């Protein structure tokens, strides 16, 4: 009886581990480096559905209004890829590190994506000669 219970619990734990790996991102963070103020930048994160069921993004939220995630509402079939486009508006000078939380219907824990960089003052433009 103890052996049966142990194997049952072990099987459940293993299945939760597999569930957490159903969606795999090619990268979890991206560094823009130095970017000019007031010039929005975008990075596209790619993921693969390794699960048996279609992966559906329930929501993607950024920690502030300066960062915007965009994604497809369509299910991603087994073995297929999809993307999440993250745009940062670069309005405030200085370093930044922003997180985007992605929740998939087929995965228990949300995925956290991070973008980082430094916003520097825009270079002055040369005035046209008159």
Annotate each predicted stretch with a short phrase.
Residues 1-23:
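Bacterial Sec-dependent N-terminal signal peptides
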Residues 30, 43, 80-86:
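Short strand-edge motifs at loop-to-beta-strand transitions and within beta-strands
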Residues 52-81:
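Surface-exposed binding patches on compact interaction domains or structured appendages
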